[in-house]
Curated annotation (Swiss-Prot):
Family matches, as InterPro entries: KOW (IPR005824), Rib_uL2_dom2 (IPR014722), Ribosomal_uL24 (IPR003256), Ribosomal_uL24_CS (IPR005825), Ribosomal_uL24_KOW (IPR041988), Translation_prot_SH3-like_sf (IPR008991)
Keywords: Ribonucleoprotein, Ribosomal protein, RNA-binding, rRNA-binding
Name of this chain's protein: Large ribosomal subunit protein uL24
HAMAP family, A to Z: Ribosomal_uL24_B
SMART domains: KOW (SM00739)
Source species: Desulforapulum autotrophicum (strain ATCC 43914 / DSM 3382 / VKM B-1955 / HRM2)
Entry GO terms, CC: ribonucleoprotein complex; ribosome
Amino acid sequence: MENFKLKIKKEDKVKVLTGKDKGKIGKVLKVLRKKNRAVVENINVAKIHQRPTQANPQGGIVDKPMPVDCSNLMIMCNSCIKPVRVGIKQLEDGKKVRICKSCNEQIDA
C-alpha cells in the first residue's frame, strides 16, 4: 500500500456519505493513512467479544467503532455548517492550512 495524502485529520467533524450510517455526523478518533481509512465516533460500530483480563475482569460484549473508508466521509465546515470539499491554501508565512471550498474559511483551528 502507498501513503495517501488525506485531508481528514484527527478531531475533525465529518459526515458519512454512504453505507449503513449514511447521514450521521461524528468526530474522527483515529486516521489510518496506509489503509485510507478513519475511525469515527459512533459510526460503523461492531460488537466485540472481549475475554476477561486483569484490566476488565468481567469481559463481555463491547461496542467498538470500526474504520470507514475516507472516500465515504466529508468534512463539516464550522462556518457554513455543511459538508464541504477541502482545499489547501498557503499563508504569507509559508504555513499551509485547509480551507472550505464553498466559503473560503479556514478549517484548521
